[in-house]
Regions:
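Eukaryotic helix-grip
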Residues: 1-351
Length: 351
């Protein structure tokens, strides 16, 4: 059984929103998404995918995906530049902490995969789907769904807006030298279009407060605003543009925060894999007969895949399953939107 700290983790079971608050949240998120979308369009159409290295310092790369951090205010001033005036760095929830210089992060480049698979891996509107996603992506420690605002539908299977709570591992946390950090935030996913018709997937995380979400004992409340855009630029190649800022609260030093933030942005490379594994699980349950017929055909090529699913007793389980290579190919090539529509309709595999 895989380690799962999501069960009974919800510290704020009383959070809900009125219809008026729901519409306000939708408007708020739409504004953030449009602001960020303009940045992506500018990066593609005006900057021609070129990063201004006077402003941005390279931190880390993974294959063709590159992570940068904005240079310190002192360095920018020496080059005659001002800090980025981005919503991510100016509209975080106030935490009454003294002003501090937080690193703005940037992720640009490409990675392998199909955008629909990626978006199926990203969208996680329920607790069970969050647990499955975390088992593949390893992007958080514990989490809870506080209140759904917009749920995926058959017409828009990748669109969601959910109020959530999560904890994440921070540097030195395992040593007990620093306290656990938690976040209350809105998470939004969906599809937009460039003026030329190109589909662009988006993923937004932005901190938010409610009267019911007061800070918890033995935890430090952090704030974050992070967005990502994904676009298919050729077969099996996804363009990525992501940026954001995380304030972990307390006194974590910049030199410790930057590597952790870089790793978090690089975890986006796991979204496609997550989507593919969810498709295989979906086909295994929905089309078992097709797999059984295929197994009757002798095939020396076999694959062993570790699949995550929710058992009848609510436990998250990872199990090694043997497939013939042809079945794996059939599953990974199936339409992720079909699986996402099933997820939107509340199919048992993705409650």
């Amino acid at each position: 059984m895989v380690k799962d700290r999501f069960i009974n983790a919800n510290p704020y079971p009383d959070v809900n929103v009125s219809e008026e608050e729901r519409l306000q949240l939708i408007d708020l998120v739409d504004g953030f998404v449009q602001d960020y979308f303009q940045k992506y369009e500018k990066f593609v159409l005006v900057d021609k995918h070129q990063v201004d290295e006077r402003r941005w310092e390279h931190v880390k790369s993974k294959d063709n995906l590159h992570i940068y951090t904005e240079r310190s205010q002192k360095e920018l001033a020496s080059k005659g530049l001002q800090p980025e005036n981005a919503p991510s760095s100016t509209e975080l929830v106030d935490d009454d902490s003294p002003e501090k210089e937080l690193p703005v992060m940037l992720s640009v480049g490409t990675f392998v995969g199909e955008m629909d698979d990626l978006m199926f891996g990203v969208v996680n509107p329920t607790l069970d789907v969050m647990r499955i996603k975390a088992s593949y992506v390893h992007d958080l420690d514990s989490a809870a769904v506080l209140c759904p605002v917009v749920e995926p539908s058959e017409e828009e299977p990748f669109r969601s807006l959910v109020v959530k709570w999560m904890t994440i591992d921070v540097p030195l946390q395992s040593t007990n030298l620093v306290k656990c950090r938690d976040f209350v935030y809105i998470e939004a996913t969906g599809i937009l279009h460039f003026t030329n018709g190109d589909r662009v997937g988006y993923h937004l995380l932005h901190s938010i407060n409610f009267p019911q979400t007061k800070p918890l004992p033995n935890r430090i409340r952090g704030n974050l605003s992070v967005f990502g855009f994904f676009r298919q630029i050729e077969e099996n190649v996804i363009d990525n543009f992501a940026s954001g800022i995380v304030d972990p609260g307390g006194d974590i030093m910049r030199f410790l925060l930057i590597p952790a933030a870089a790793e978090a942005l690089l975890s986006a490379t796991n979204y496609v894999y997550c989507g593919q594994m969810k498709k295989i699980s979906w086909m295994l349950q929905r089309r078992r007969s097709a797999f059984e017929r295929q197994e009757q055909v002798k095939n020396s090529d076999e694959c062993i895949i570790r699949i995550s699913f929710i058992a009848l007793d609510g436990q998250l389980i990872q199990r090694k399953v043997t497939f013939c290579a042809k079945c794996v190919g059939m599953a990974t090539k199936c339409d992720a939107q079909d699986a996402a529509r099933d997820q939107a309709e509340g199919y048992a595999a993705y409650k």
